[in-house]
Design a protein with these regions (language model features):
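Feature captures the catalytic ectodomains and active-site-proximal regions of enzymes
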Residues: 1-508
């Protein structure tokens, strides 16, 4: 017998704001199907940033955090918040993994290297954590500390790297410890789509001291801007002598978000790595991950291991004999699987996964439809198979194209999502099921700064929540992403487990 599926359709980066004109690609797009859903079915908006998703007040949401909260059915306090708290309360100074690995380098007369994204974006890393680890290194008596700075320009303004590097240099001057040894744009150092040629350039700067040589980081970033290369695309370069990573050194990867830290970590830690040839083989360093990037990764230690989440939606469905499909293109596949399952890599019994390859283009403004048509077509087939009780689906376009800062491309991205949503929602309704349409955070609804320059980061805006085919129900205001799973479960025919402290968005 065919199942009547319950679908959660996540339009990644589709935020909602009263500003319907300036720089709002969501409002500017021709999206007749999504508009019709919002007019016909019950709709509200829900919070997807700040304390509502376990981040500091005013901190924009992101895909990892959003999917974790949606899958958990409770507010999950994020690594950003937990690490910041440990610094403020003096707990970082006692962190056993950091203490042990810093001490190993100091006692052997070797260097400590901090590597990671710089700035206050708060999506992958945070300046406060850099400052905390630097203060700890000084406290422990470290003499040789080198910083390998990855510039952002996606989760922060494309020219904000200059200021972030200056802030970091000011901290080094204040402490009297540390030098910025290299600068690299995240396009090279934080790829997540197996573009090993990019990562090799960053690795060569870190380990071999290869790339353009500059007197300091300020000179490097100015040269990059002069060459029309914004923060994301800074070519890996070297900014001081003697800062190469060598055997016996300690390397601390400052990023707490896993997806864009895994590839570089694999280069350093995996003996079986074959993405490119590591001259002299794997570097014999003491490697510390600020958070867990991959539970199976060898030759590294985790400073802040994940908090185990019990009875997340995927686990709960599986234990109650329900079948589920997770489907997305490459860019968001980890989000509908690993993050949605609370950081668990392996699928649960009855959980099928489907990844559609993301297009191989330099930047997604060149192909704003991305792989949405293919994701929708595959999802429609799977719905029609009658096999699944629950479908978790992500369309990546509004976020990934939003990050390019190209307004016209973002409009096309929204329009591509509209066509894709039409295909899958129609299929679910035809199968007698229901769907919940939402987003994990904002992005495409703000593509321009007030001065007209591109805005490439996420936003703190609310996101839409539409209950489609759920009957004539009322939706409350003031909900958040953690409330989605408890809203879905009655339609799946299951009670809400005690661990899910979120509250249904549907008013009884």
């Amino acid at each position: 017998m065919s199942k009547k599926p319950v679908m959660l359709c996540i339009m990644d980066g589709f935020g909602w704001t009263p500003n319907k004109t300036y720089g709002n690609a969501v409002a500017a797009a021709n999206k007749p199907f999504i508009d019709s859903l919002m007019a016909k079915y019950p709709m509200t908006t829900i919070d997807a940033s700040g304390m509502a998703v376990g981040l500091p007040d005013g901190q924009m949401g992101n895909s990892e955090v959003g999917h974790t909260n949606m899958g958990a059915g409770r507010i999950v306090y994020q690594q950003l918040t937990l690490i910041t708290k440990s610094i403020r309360e003096g707990e970082m100074l006692k962190n056993p993994v950091l203490v042990k690995n810093m001490k190993a380098a100091i006692d052997a007369g070797k260097a400590i290297h901090l590597m990671g994204l710089v700035g206050t974006g708060g999506v992958h890393s945070h300046a406060d954590h850099w400052f905390g680890v630097l203060e700890m290194a000084k406290h422990m008596g470290a003499k040789e500390v080198y910083l390998h700075c990855i510039t952002d320009g996606r989760d922060t303004d494309p020219h904000s790297g200059k200021g972030f590097l200056a802030d970091l240099q000011a901290k080094l001057d204040e402490l009297g410890v540390g030098k910025i040894a290299s600068v690299s744009g995240r396009y090279y150092a934080m790829d997540r789509d197996n573009n090993w040629d990019r990562e090799e350039k960053a690795y060569a700067a870190f380990v071999y001291g290869e790339g353009e040589q500059y007197a300091n980081a300020a000179e490097a970033i100015e040269a990059s801007y002069a060459n029309d290369k914004t923060d994301e695309f800074v070519l890996p370069c070297v900014t001081c002598e003697g800062g190469r990573m060598q055997d016996g050194d300690t390397v601390i990867f400052m990023n707490f978000r896993p997806d864009r830290a895994r590839q570089m970590t694999r280069i350093f830690c995996d003996d079986a790595f074959t993405g490119f040839e590591r001259r002299g083989g794997r570097k014999q360093v003491h490697y510390v991950c600020m958070a867990e990037y991959d539970a199976t990764m060898p030759n590294c230690e985790v400073a802040y291991p994940p908090v185990e989440l019990k009875n997340v939606l995927g686990q709960y469905l599986s234990e109650n004999g329900k079948t589920q499909l997770r489907i997305a293109e490459t860019e968001k596949y980890a989000h509908v699987t690993f993050f949605f399952n609370g950081g668990v890599e392996a699928p649960y019994a009855g959980e099928d996964r489907c990844v559609i390859p993301s297009p191989k283009v330099a930047t997604y403004d060149l192909q704003p439809e991305m792989s949405a048509p293919e994701v929708a077509a595959e999802c429609k087939q799977r719905i029609e198979s009658g096999k699944y009780d629950v479908i978790i689906l992500n369309f990546a376009n509004c976020d990934m194209v939003g990050h390019t800062g190209v307004f016209e491309a973002a409009v096309k991205a929204v329009e591509a999502v509209d066509a894709a949503v039409k295909e899958v929602v129609t299929a679910v309704l035809d199968a007698g099921g229901c769907a919940f349409l939402t987003a994990d955070h904002g992005n495409a609804e703000k593509m321009k700064n007030p001065d007209g320059t591109p805005f490439t980061a996420h936003t703190t805006n609310v996101v839409p929540f539409v209950a489609i085919g759920c009957g004539d129900v009322k939706l409350r205001e003031g909900g958040c992403l953690a409330d989605i799973a408890p809203t879905m479960l009655p339609y799946i025919g299951l009670p809400v487990p005690a661990e899910m402290t979120g509250k249904s968005i549907i008013v009884e």
